Amino acid sequence: MSRFFTTGSDSESESSLSGEELVTKPVGGNYGKQPLLLSEDEEDTKRVVRSAKDKRFEELTNLIRTIRNAMKIRDVTKCLEEFELLGKAYGKAKSIVDKEGVPRFYIRILADLEDYLNELWEDKEGKKKMNKNNAKALSTLRQKIRKYNRDFESHITSYKQNPEQSADEDAEKNEEDSEGSSDEDEDEDGVSAATFLKKKSEAPSGESRKFLKKMDDEDEDSEDSEDDEDWDTGSTSSDSDSEEEEGKQTALASRFLKKAPTTDEDKKAAEKKREDKAKKKHDRKSKRLDEEEEDNEGGEWERVRGGVPLVKEKPKMFAKGTEITHAVVIKKLNEILQARGKKGTDRAAQIELLQLLVQIAAENNLGEGVIVKIKFNIIASLYDYNPNLATYMKPEMWGKCLDCINELMDILFANPNIFVGENILEESENLHNADQPLRVRGCILTLVERMDEEFTKIMQNTDPHSQEYVEHLKDEAQVCAIIERVQRYLEEKGTTEEVCRIYLLRILHTYYKFDYKAHQRQLTPPEGSSKSEQDQAENEGEDSAVLMERLCKYIYAKDRTDRIRTCAILCHIYHHALHSRWYQARDLMLMSHLQDNIQHADPPVQILYNRTMVQLGICAFRQGLTMDAHNALLDIQSSGRAKELLGQGLLLRSLQERNQEQEKVERRRQVPFHLHINLELLECVYLVSAMLLEIPYMAAHESDARRRMISKQFHHQLRVGERQPLLGPPESMREHVVAASKAMKMGDWKTCHSFIINEKMNGKVWDLFPEADKVRTMLVRKIQEESLRTYLFTYSSVYDSISMETLSDMFELDLPTVHSIISKMIINEELMASLDQPTQTVVMHRTEPTAQQNLALQLAEKLGSLVENNERVFDHKQGTYGGYFRDQKDGYRKNEGYMRRGGYRQQQSQTAY
């Protein structure tokens, strides 16, 4: 045992009194006078053996323990301080590490600390709750640990690949070699410093091995005595007595030579002590587990062991022998509902009680009125299961909700005498009197609207690229079926306002779906289809276009709220545009005047408006109306926030612009993935439309320095393409459009066509359209026509006349089309030329300046501006400011400056006379 403990202990005084004849334990100054008669020379020898290594690694272990304690209490400032000390201590032990290798407990703390800091850094809510010092220390320590760990990257990687094996190896060595470290250290670090220090001395030979074994036993004795010191002071005296007896038996020379006789009895005693120590450790662990179990009694947590699952008994709703009547069931229902929303209420148990109450009511034939009332409360409890608005329903709860609503609708359809409404008071409810119509307070429409919201939240919070999303999307068929059933119910018994609301729900689940069957029926004439196909079409019901027309017209006529009517109009326009009914969609948009006041609508309606405008622009593009397509898409694409404006994601902004609450609200407004519009397709349509408009315009106004830009985004893409020093083959969609634009500038329509329509662009964009071949044919036609216009604008100064047949062959257009294009250009005064009908040629008038003349005009303009600037500089040097005296040179020369020519002096001279 150490001198620091033996000096002030009672056991030492007792041993010195009992054994006065043996001078074996001098203290204080006697230590230096009698070095050969010490009773603690075993410990002195031990310190000599471990002095070069153990001190350094014990220091590292203590610092690591402090860091781990700081990590547990989230004290990052303390972690930073101790990490700096740890680095200094490791630098002191560098010579030992070079010989022995990096200790694994050191690698482990580096890896764990880095992972811990990364978790804190990613926890945004936790970072906001940190105080200023901890937040600053977190940033500093994170940078330091990342920089520091670069030197140990290979060690950390190997540790992370197999941390369990590393811990097991260290634990084995710890059990075999180090008996001097505490159990808490083993739990904290997994590897002790003593284990690492004894790696290379595992196989000493001869008597030195015996002596080392003896030293291990003595170390174990000393630790056991330290562990027991707090409980029994007598153990210390007995240990010291045994050490004195050993000191008598062993010669001093053998002490200095670090050799000691080792017998089989000593080995057995050491093994027994190891077993006792392991038993103590196991007892402490089991005691800790028992204490945890006692603490958890009466709480929610329960320790479960493998085996047969526990079957809980059903709760008893009523006492034995109670007569089940309507009043008793309603009273029990009110008791259950009183706990709803209170803190500590088990919501799952509440739902289970309500379901059990339904079974009891059905078994006792209490009537459908009671069952309907309980069903309403079950569905409401399912919606309240998650109190947080951001969280979505679990799959099992969602399934229960759908089943319960279907069961409720079955009861309502089977019992027409049951009336359900929000305006029915609880006092006026009739739940059991069959002579009168049954009246139940509740709103089936509100439940269905909440069901639709929950479905949207489920789709928003599911990974769209997973199979789980597909499984959830299959539930939409059930949702639509429930909405359709409620629609039929409300058409019979609901008010006009309720019918408008349920119609809007039906519209919102229909407007974005492309009706392929109706599209095929339009392509296939009735004469060409078989009788079975016609019968099948009749059985399928009305087309989506007819359904949308019927529902929307009812809302237009009956609705009294602007919001429902606005949403219905936008959905109707979207559906028309999706099915290529451009003129109906355009007329409905213009007649509604929504673009005038849409900025006053709420954000979800604005998102729907943006989606409708985008779909309208894509529809115009499919019809070949590039100008209309460009105008419809201009506002969305020019903002650079198409993703956010369409409700398909959030852009990265600074925290100052959007706090956490605003971000949550905006995420709840996002459109589910299956409603998304392809942003790459949208951008491609916009850029191609801009190309077909901008390139001919640029060619027509090439010499005009003040020409306006039709599309800033298109010009930006052109500038980006021109900045590249090396131009390779285009890869992205934007690069394809830029390359096609450069080819169109030269009038090379074939190269332009090859860049716009190829396998890569087909896969990314054009194959996504319902009528892809029709769109590609339209694009080829547009490229040929605009390339012809660009060619005439660019090279009109080169030709005196050109044959229309030549132009027809060059651009593979028929002669009437070429004639029509040139005639429009001449009528609009875009091309100064005339048509010679007998020869079918275009005669150029050469009224516009040539390229050389344009350059001369530009030079003259610049020289004129240069002369004006020089005159201003000269006047400034002469002392005339603002150009005043430049215009009044005669008055200046005649000494009639502005001080001499005022009306004030004239008035003075007149008054003098």
UniProtKB/Swiss-Prot annotation:
It comes from the Eukaryota. The gene is EIF3C. The modification Phosphothreonine is found at residue 524. GO terms for molecular function: RNA binding; translation initiation factor activity; translation initiation factor binding. Residues 166-190, 217-232 have a biased composition (Acidic residues). The modification N6-acetyllysine is found at residues 99, 643. This is Eukaryotic translation initiation factor 3 subunit C. Belongs to the eIF-3 subunit C family. Pfam families: eIF-3c_N (PF05470), PCI (PF01399). It is found in: Cytoplasm. GO terms for cellular component: eukaryotic 43S preinitiation complex; eukaryotic 48S preinitiation complex; eukaryotic translation initiation factor 3 complex. Residues 522-531 have a biased composition (Polar residues). Residues 673-849 form the PCI domain. One of its GO terms (biological process) is formation of cytoplasmic translation initiation complex. PANTHER family: EUKARYOTIC TRANSLATION INITATION FACTOR 3, SUBUNIT 8 EIF3S8 -RELATED, EUKARYOTIC TRANSLATION INITIATION FACTOR 3 SUBUNIT C-RELATED. It comes from Pongo abelii. InterPro entries: EIF3C (IPR027516), EIF3C_N_dom (IPR008905), PCI_dom (IPR000717), WH-like_DNA-bd_sf (IPR036388), WH_DNA-bd_sf (IPR036390). Phosphorylated. Phosphorylation is enhanced upon serum stimulation. Residues 1-44, 157-301, 522-542, 885-913 are annotated as: Disordered. Component of the eukaryotic translation initiation factor 3 (eIF-3) complex, which is composed of 13 subunits: EIF3A, EIF3B, EIF3C, EIF3D, EIF3E, EIF3F, EIF3G, EIF3H, EIF3I, EIF3J, EIF3K, EIF3L and EIF3M. The eIF-3 complex appears to include 3 stable modules: module A is composed of EIF3A, EIF3B, EIF3G and EIF3I; module B is composed of EIF3F, EIF3H, and EIF3M; and module C is composed of EIF3C, EIF3D, EIF3E, EIF3K and EIF3L. EIF3C of module C binds EIF3B of module A and EIF3H of module B, thereby linking the three modules. EIF3J is a labile subunit that binds to the eIF-3 complex via EIF3B. Component of the eukaryotic translation initiation factor 3 (eIF-3) complex, which is required for several steps in the initiation of protein synthesis. The eIF-3 complex associates with the 40S ribosome and facilitates the recruitment of eIF-1, eIF-1A, eIF-2:GTP:methionyl-tRNAi and eIF-5 to form the 43S pre-initiation complex (43S PIC). The eIF-3 complex stimulates mRNA recruitment to the 43S PIC and scanning of the mRNA for AUG recognition.
